[in-house]
From Swiss-Prot:
It comes from the Bacteria. This is Cytochrome b559 subunit alpha. Coiled coil: none annotated. Its cofactor is heme b. The chain crosses the membrane at residues 21-35. HAMAP family: PSII_PsbE. Belongs to the PsbE/PsbF family. InterPro entries: PSII_cyt_b559_asu, PSII_cyt_b559_asu_sf, PSII_cyt_b559_CS, PSII_cyt_b559_N, PSII_cytb559_asu_lum. Heterodimer of an alpha subunit and a beta subunit. PSII is composed of 1 copy each of membrane proteins PsbA, PsbB, PsbC, PsbD, PsbE, PsbF, PsbH, PsbI, PsbJ, PsbK, PsbL, PsbM, PsbT, PsbX, PsbY, PsbZ, Psb30/Ycf12, peripheral proteins PsbO, CyanoQ (PsbQ), PsbU, PsbV and a large number of cofactors. It forms dimeric complexes.
Length: 82
């Protein structure tokens, strides 16, 4: 016979009013916080990724494609210098 872990059954947790009071506040708050994090551009600053309009400058409009894997470092350096 299996023992018990002493934890509440999941069905008791999901049907409790306390669970829904807490989660009806936290889930929308997390969604709104994530939306603000991305829409204000803070996510770009935190993770250091370029914004969509910064991928290609006016001077460089071609794709930076590496063709030869054995000379990849040299090709990347040439693409950066352009």
């Amino acid at each position: 016979m299996s023992g018990t872990t002493g934890e509440r059954p999941f069905s008791d947790i999901v049907t409790s009013i306390r669970y829904w009071v807490i989660h009806s506040i936290t889930i929308p708050a997390l969604f709104i916080a994530g939306w603000l994090f991305v829409s204000t551009g803070l996510a770009y600053d935190v993770f250091g990724t370029p914004r969509p309009d910064e991928y290609y400058t006016q001077a460089r409009q071609e794709l930076p494609i590496v063709n030869n894997r054995f000379e990849a470092k040299k090709q990347v350096e040439q693409l950066i210098q352009k």
